[in-house]
Amino acid sequence: MQEVNGSIAILGSGETSPNLVSVHRNLINKIDGEVIASLIDTPFGFQENADQLVDKLIEFYDVSLNLEINLASFRNKKYFKSVEYFEFIKKIQSSNFIFSGPG
């Protein structure tokens, strides 16, 4: 059996509240070397304010955690197996920290 290293944190409401900054920081601190962070917008991509949520999440990671997080966007399943889809997969595969949410 192949050993896999990593962590998953499942957070409920308030995932970007000040009370949970320490959870994000703990996960980030466990990463050896450079942190390559991605934000998946799929869970909330259907919402009219999805772009504003992306901006707020990027700002949260910048201000609260001093971390640049890059958007890995895939909002519509009709683009499955498109160039957009494979670009999304490539970003995820090259990341060692992934945030997906809220939604």
Describe each model-derived feature in a short phrase.
Residues 1-103:
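Extended, subdomain-level signal for the structured scaffold at the beginning of enzyme domains
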